[in-house]
Amino acid sequence: MRFSAVSRHHRGASIDPMTFSEATTPDALTPDAHTPRLLTCDVLYTGMGGAQSPGGVVVVGETVAAAGHPDELRRQYPHAAEERAGAVIAPPPVNAHTHLDMSAYEFQALPYFQWIPEVVIRGRHLRGVAAAQAGADTLTRLGAGGVGDIVWAPEVMDALLAREDLSGTLYFEVLNPFPDKADEVFAAARTHLERWRRLERPGLRLGLSPHTPFTVSHRLMRLLSDYAAGEGLPLQIHVAEHPTELEMFRTGGGPLWDNRMPALYPHTLAEVIGREPGPDLTPVRYLDELGVLAARPTLVHMVNVTPDDIARVARAGCAVVTCPRSNHHLECGTFDWPAFAAAGVEVALGTDSVASGETLNVREEVTFARQLYPGLDPRVLVRAAVKGGQRVVGGRTPFLRRGETWQEGFRWELSRDL
């Protein structure tokens, strides 16, 4: 099955390379408001059930009249003016994991250990409210169906919570690897969270993000996850992004631990996680046995995992967000999507920051994933970008069904042939 790229060049319309273009036929240039239009595509996802291929939607004026297989729609609406809508017709995709406050960074593809000091640390002065607002503006312009944003600075949370043009979850990020500081750090985080809960409005809601299993002490991790579970706050945790994270939990050392800033960490990993590393210990197993998976956090990346890890995630009912372009650019490995899908784990797509993911456009993430997983049914990718994302960020998936309003944002056209 192939997506095909079709572009539009009528009425002087320009094409934004950051978005998917639309496609029309000459018959569509001057449509009668009461003449049905049959829009066809390679993959149709109506927001219900699974996606189908091929697909089509009949639109009359600005209202959806029917959706289904093109042959059946041609039979039901023989006088409909047919046009190709593009590769995909579906509700807008969700960017389920990103860092909007890094939107002023330049994209750089570098090995993970080079990227952190040369990009993240060197460019830290670029982070802040202005960058986050610019990133949020980009998502709005792209017509994103929702966002899962990791927020580090309180002033960024204040600014983003006030926006009414986005939906999804803003996850307040907390990190501190010293167990003796856990109560103090938790108390400060709780003070912020309780104030922000009073500022929530329809659209963006509040969440919590303990950074990683090795930058948050075992005590703080448990305090945060228990609090989130009790308060109904969604969680996101970065887990198993780089191969050396797995090595670190097995041996207590390796490049990831050795390249840390010593003044910011205890002397040993055992002090951080409250147990000795071991050959069978993984970040996922650690979180599970600590009781954190019981809070059903969304786990981000999950590239370097074992079959037992996948089984634990499935049993706990945790969702996973994969960021294919970022993982590729930082040489982290490839997320085992088929294995997670076989285990019944809900998968969503995110871009990570523009510094590693290049853009905030999830449609481009779908394009890249289609190349990365040639054996994976593209219907799975589309559903993950929509339904999987909405389930992660707590949104409602729009439906393409009879009587619903048609939106041009339902047209997805890939930027290149695959």
Curated annotation (Swiss-Prot):
SUPFAM superfamilies: Composite domain of metallo-dependent hydrolases, Metallo-dependent hydrolases. GO terms for molecular function: hydrolase activity, acting on carbon-nitrogen (but not peptide) bonds; metal ion binding. One of its GO terms (biological process) is menaquinone biosynthetic process. It is an enzyme of class 3 (hydrolase). Binds 1 zinc ion per subunit. Zn(2+) binds at residues 97, 99, 238, 352. The active site is at 241 (proton donor). Substrate binds at residues 173, 211. It comes from the Bacteria. Its EC number is 3.5.4.40. Coiled coil: none annotated. Its cofactor is Zn(2+). The keyword Zinc applies. Belongs to the metallo-dependent hydrolases superfamily. This is Aminodeoxyfutalosine deaminase. It comes from Deinococcus radiodurans (strain ATCC 13939 / DSM 20539 / JCM 16871 / CCUG 27074 / LMG 4051 / NBRC 15346 / NCIMB 9279 / VKM B-1422 / R1).
